[in-house]
Amino acid sequence: MALENRLGITDSAELARTEEKISKQKALKLFETGILDTLTPGTSETLCAIHKYLFEDIYDFAGKIREVNIAKGNFRFAPLMYLCSALENIDKMPQSSFDEIIEKYVEMNVAHPFREGNGRSTRIWLDLMLKKEIGYVVDWSKVDKEDYLLAMERSPIKDIEIKFLLKNALTDLSLIH
């Protein structure tokens, strides 16, 4: 059974495919139109704006903090009763170095503020911080999806793997322009 959506899709596999297609198109627009550059890096408000932009055509809850507890496998994300204070604490975390930015990214992943679409939204949120704070972005084509998911799963306990993976995929913005 699929999450309730604006498209009336009831098959979860079909919804996942459609969601990926639409959100990738919207992500591209977010970068190409310069909308992303108008947002403040590293805030939960910015993450909500990114999520809303990516998923507003699909879900009514786009850009809204979740109102239910969620888990993936055996991992429970931040409980609802602590979610708002977790987001406030994440907003206050420093973001002036690669390590600080990744630590903030890991904490946001643990918070998982949305019912669906957290990964796509937070990766864009991460790239915005990296771009504005240290002049780099992740070349996601250089990141093995399986290695990334395993590293993210372990990151709340030990973030060295995710830092290593992402540091090796950084692209210097001055080389792009």
Model-derived regions, located:
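FIC/Doc superfamily catalytic core
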Residues: 1-177
